[in-house]
């Protein structure tokens, strides 16, 4: 398969910055993807699984970078998109569902990913490094139990390994694991879910910014954006 991400303009940036003037326009990114996979049902269809191997080539890869135009003024911190020549992604995806009983099924999804930045002339120091926000390992495991009177209970555990926050610096996140639970009711016309996400209120970070913001020396410091804390809510759906 082949696809592309359209190009664009870096607007609202400081036109006095030489790098910005050279990067006002960025080109489309092109992706060529190769996949090979199998799916099957085993043991009278109690076990369903799929296995996919993929390889992707990215040409004129778009990367979001950040920089502080004036080292003494944190208000000049800006973002811009550049084309980083080439990128490479490959990995494995495994999904499975197992019906342990008529009222209980278990699921497990695993992902293994390797990425690489290639031929970025303005950042040769990143040659061969993994791309940002591309954890090598990810997984989701859990189960769904159907109770009496159209009630059900679902438990899910999601996890990711560490990943680079940005293509502008080399700081990485920590691996994390989140647990979600849903208690619900469903019939042909109506459904209601009481859900708790991140039930153990784990701290984890989703983005990281590295720049100088504190006087007098404005030493580069890592600032993290926290992921969602524990959330409790209700979802209602009605079929007309």
Across the structure, where does each feature detected by a protein language model lie?
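C-terminal beta-barrel architecture of Gram-negative outer-membrane proteins
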Residues: 17-19, 117, 132-186, 197-201, ...
